[in-house]
């Protein structure tokens, strides 16, 4: 039974879903903005909030956990350098999701997720 699932299934097995979210997280932190479906954006929001929370913590253990999740090691180091000054006064809400026009091919609800 699927009671109280925290992450949407996204129509994929668990390993593919994790790889998708890792890739989107890496891209969002690198670019600052990603266009994807609304459901993926909502799932991505939790992962990005977790990574920025680790970066604000700044400990060695948090850095190692982030390196294990984000694909680019240099990106992790730059995130840890900038996160405290950029998000130091925030307790959460590091991302913004803006709905856009539906995708042309299959009419899927699209959204832009960006770092605040």
From Swiss-Prot:
Pfam families per record: Ribosomal_L17
Organism for this UniProt entry: Prochlorococcus marinus (strain SARG / CCMP1375 / SS120)
Lineage: superkingdom: Bacteria
Protein name, per record: Large ribosomal subunit protein bL17
Gene3D superfamilies registered for this protein in UniProt: Ribosomal protein L17
HAMAP family: Ribosomal_bL17
Biological process, per Gene Ontology: translation
Entry similarity comment: Belongs to the bacterial ribosomal protein bL17 family.
Signal peptide segment: none
Lineage: Bacteria, Bacillati, Cyanobacteriota, Cyanophyceae, Synechococcales
Underlying gene: rplQ
Record GO terms (molecular function): structural constituent of ribosome
Keywords in alphabetical order: Ribonucleoprotein, Ribosomal protein
Any GO CC annotation of this UniProt entry: cytosolic large ribosomal subunit
Record flagged with keyword Transferase: no
Quaternary data: Part of the 50S ribosomal subunit. Contacts protein L32.
